[in-house]
Amino acid sequence: MNKFIILALFAVAAASAMPNYPPPPPKPYHAPPPPPHHAHPPPPPPPPAHYGHHAHPAPAPVVHTYPVHAPHAKCGANLLVGCAPSVAHAPCVPLHGHGHGYPAPAPHYRAPESDSFDQFEE
């Protein structure tokens, strides 16, 4: 109990010994002045790190088109080249429908029936 009283007296003495200054007044906020009109732009940011490799310029984009449109195809006849070259008439209208020239999909197979395995059991 004596220790508690001594600690309480010590805390009161320490609190009363501290100076009681008033808090400082808050500083007024002022926005920074705008930059003059002849100010230089900020420098560009440094290039990103390449982890020890030298920086290489990016390649130019590749354009996968022809510089001009293809001429209109004549629908009169096509030259078929083979063992015996010949000329065959080609239609001017493309054929649409019937799967667009692709074969039918592969058929689905049924699962084996259970009685096919019964012949092996005795």
From Swiss-Prot:
Keyword Lipid metabolism: no
Chain intervals for the UniProt region annotation (Disordered): 21-63, 103-122
Main location: secreted
Biased composition (Pro residues): 21-49
Signal sequence bounds: 1-17
Expression (tissue specificity): Expressed in the middle and posterior regions of the follicle cells.
Span of domain VM: 69-109
Any one GO CC term of the record: extracellular space
Entry keywords, A to Z: Secreted, Signal
Compartments reported by the entry: Secreted
Highest taxon of source: Eukaryota
Family the UniProt entry places it in: Belongs to the vitelline membrane protein family.
Protein name according to UniProt: Vitelline membrane protein 15a-3
Organism: Aedes aegypti (Yellowfever mosquito)
Gene behind the chain: 15a-3
